[in-house]
Amino acid sequence: MGLSPFNLLFAELEVGKHLYWQIGNIRIHGQVFMTSWILIGALLTLVVVGTKKMERDPKGVQNLLEFLWDYIRDLARTQIGEKVYRDWMPFIGTLFLFIFVSNWGGALIPWRFIKLPSGELGAPTADINTTVALALLVSLSYFYAGLSNKGLRYFEYYVHPTPIMLPFKIVEDFTKPLSLSFRLFGNILADELVVAVLVFLVPLVLPVPVMFLGLFTSAIQALIFATLAAYYIGEAVEEHH
Amino acid sequence: MDSITTAASVVAAGLAVGLGAIGPGIGQGSAAQGAVEGIARQPEAEGKIRGTLLLSFAFMESLTIYGLVVALVLLFANPFAG
């Protein structure tokens, strides 16, 4: 870390401070793992409870899950297309739900009451490592989708309208994960920072509307990440004529 | 790091995001205008318009995000820190 202006100005913000766990030669950010596991556990519990006793007339949790299923299916079907969307729906749905629950969990659960030796608990998606991992997963899966559906004809996509597009399409393969990961990371970190700065300046009332705005944008970011992942996969499996 | 490099990095980081936000801001404005006009003319197409609008917003936003990447590199991983 070269310089950290936030730490100088606001001692509480703690950008770039982490709870390090040493595993072999790797130092990992422990607080991200803790929050991710808690949130994954909550999500799994919800899904298991909701699908335990399924009824013809959905009620309560089952109703919510069926609504989510419909929502994700529509998202995947419009972006990927009728033919292969079924294969990719679980992936898109997992991405959407994990990011959504991470963003909202980071904002809604009062993590501040749990004290850590260093760093603080928060949204797992406010850490660049989480979002880069998710974005690289998306990259791998659209390559896999293209290659498994069209074989080597997938590379026609690179020269599709004209071969002049070739360098741009190759650069795009690198900028796709870059922009996916930084979009999510930047938005979530910015939300947390804005709320933290406002709480620091005016601890009453004023931060509340900003918190609601943060909830709105983080829901939109989860939707955008899932939509773009589906769009990239759809682009890779699309047939050119 | 000497103080002139620090000052230049901080100013450059501010400019990278600030200038990078102008173009996409204008673009998103005109895209939103088009979407609102489309919904006003054809309210039943709202769902489809919203999906396309969000997707195109995301592509425009990525331009600002490249500015953000540059700013974060300057602030937290400065190659000239020495």
From Swiss-Prot, chain B:
Marked site positions, Reversibly protonated during proton transport: E61
Chief localisation class: membrane
Domain of life: Bacteria
Annotated TM spans: 7-27, 57-77
A molecular function (GO) term: lipid binding
PROSITE patterns: ATPASE_C
Subcellular location: Cellular thylakoid membrane
Family statement: Belongs to the ATPase C chain family.
Its job: F(1)F(0) ATP synthase produces ATP from ADP in the presence of a proton or sodium gradient. F-type ATPases consist of two structural domains, F(1) containing the extramembraneous catalytic core and F(0) containing the membrane proton channel, linked together by a central stalk and a peripheral stalk. During catalysis, ATP synthesis in the catalytic domain of F(1) is coupled via a rotary mechanism of the central stalk subunits to proton translocation.
NCBIfam families reported in the protein's UniProt record: ATP_synt_c, PRK07354.1
Protein name as annotated: ATP synthase subunit c
Species this chain originates from: Prochlorococcus marinus (strain MIT 9211)
Gene: atpE
